[in-house]
Amino acid sequence: MGFYNSGGYSGNSGYSNGFGSSFALIVVLFILLIIVGAAIFNY
């Protein structure tokens, strides 16, 4: 995934461990942004 390589969320030490958590974090933030954006545009 390009997001992880460019971001370098957990660095070299926790690469295998941090991949899943950082990816989940990005997905959750993205979903929250979409929900908030939809709420703002609707009102």
UniProtKB/Swiss-Prot annotation:
Family the UniProt entry places it in: Belongs to the SscA family.
Localization (cell): Membrane
InterPro entries the UniProt entry points to: YjcZ-like
Keywords assigned: Membrane, Transmembrane, Transmembrane helix
Upper lineage: Bacteria, Bacillati, Bacillota, Bacilli, Bacillales
Membrane topology field: Single-pass membrane protein
Record field: transmembrane: 21-41
DNA-binding in keyword set: no
Coiled-coil features, chain-numbered ranges: none
Record GO cellular component, one term: membrane
Pfam families with a match to the protein in the record: YjcZ_2 (PF09680)
Protein name (database record): Uncharacterized membrane protein YuzJ
NCBIfam families cross-referenced by the UniProt entry: tiny_TM_bacill
